[in-house]
């Protein structure tokens, strides 16, 4: 491991993080909705009772408390043009994919105090994730024969080949300790599938699909999946929940995307639902930015299907969304400008 990313992997800012905490809080839109950042972030993670996030323009890592106050820069490594991140379970490390001139790079970075250490990972990795419960990473490598899945330590030592697959366009995930997921890249013009590989049983099974526009997001405990499909008859998305143990599908009867939802693992799911959706091919139009939305934040009970409109998010098109571990907040990114927001639940 090196102090900072490889020189070819990022530009080192020799100035040290000042460690001074900004006294201003996040911008309060109302008593419960808070704008954590005014600038774009390239990913965020929950950290104790606060947040860690990466500033998109510089690649600097910051942390704050739960309402965006006391922001502190904790990284002195500059990596611009970050477009995808995955964090470890305690937000002490991250996998960071970024552009460097004409190349795509992937770095594994460990944040230690006010410094960072990192290594470049192989250039042929097409998808990656962190283990939910231990210090291991998983990644998918494209080969001439298809795809190979590897697990390794974050510095890419102690590699282990997990699985080989025929050629496909999969996004890999690690939703539970013994489960690895493989999801087709979603498009309303192609049928997608979701598979799960059970590490203990060495079994590879289909969970969902084939379905047009299939997008999926696992519950926090990996016991269920929220998923959206493209309904060609209405030219809009539809949202469902699937319970793996019971093999039961629940139609939430709302029009939104799996990427806009969070399931902490109980009876309630939380979804950002657009006020209106123009008929078209989804999620393609949304993912490419040709269509954007103004969302409301809803809570939906998956047993009773009772719905509660929690907030008008005004000009926010929710992209990434996560519940805090203490259940007091939900955080999300605005796809329109990349800013980070938080919503405080009622006590």
Set out the residue ranges of the language-model regions:
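Sequence signature of WD/YWTD-type beta-propeller architectures
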Residues: 1-347
């Amino acid at each position: 491991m090196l102090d900072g990313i490889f020189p070819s992997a990022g530009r080192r800012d020799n100035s040290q993080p000042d460690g001074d905490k900004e006294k201003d809080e996040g911008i309060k839109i109302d008593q419960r909705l808070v704008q954590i950042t005014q600038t774009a972030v390239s990913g965020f993670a929950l950290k104790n009772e606060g947040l860690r996030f990466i500033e998109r323009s510089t690649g600097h890592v910051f942390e704050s408390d739960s309402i965006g106050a006391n922001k502190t820069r904790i990284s002195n490594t500059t990596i611009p043009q970050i477009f995808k991140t995955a964090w470890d379970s305690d937000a002490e490390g991250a996998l960071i994919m970024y552009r460097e001139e004409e190349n795509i790079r992937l770095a594994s970075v460990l944040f230690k105090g006010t410094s960072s250490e990192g290594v470049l990972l192989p250039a042929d990795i097409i998808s990656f994730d962190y283990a939910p419960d231990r210090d291991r990473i998983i990644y998918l490598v494209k080969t001439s024969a298809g795809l190979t899945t590897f697990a390794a330590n974050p510095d890419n030592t102690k590699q282990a080949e997990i699985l080989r697959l025929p050629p496909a366009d999969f996004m890999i995930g690690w939703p539970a300790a013994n489960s690895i997921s493989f999801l087709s890249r979603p498009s309303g013009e192609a049928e997608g599938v979701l598979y799960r590989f059970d590490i203990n049983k060495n079994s590879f099974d289909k969970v969902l699909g084939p379905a047009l526009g299939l997008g999926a997001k696992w519950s926090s405990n990996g016991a269920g999946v929220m998923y959206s499909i493209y309904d060609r008859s209405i030219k809009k998305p539809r949202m469902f929940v699937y319970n793996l143990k019971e093999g039961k599908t629940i139609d939430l009867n709302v029009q939104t995307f799996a990427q806009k939802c969070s399931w902490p693992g109980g009876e309630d799911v939380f979804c950002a639902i657009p006020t209106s959706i123009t008929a078209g091919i989804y999620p393609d139009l949304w993912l490419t930015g040709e269509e954007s939305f103004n969302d409301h934040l809803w809570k939906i009970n998956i047993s009773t299907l009772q719905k509660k409109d929690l907030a008008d998010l005004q000009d926010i098109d929710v992209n990434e969304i996560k519940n805090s571990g203490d259940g007091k907040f939900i955080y999300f990114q605005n796809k329109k400008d990349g800013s980070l927001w938080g919503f405080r639940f009622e006590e």
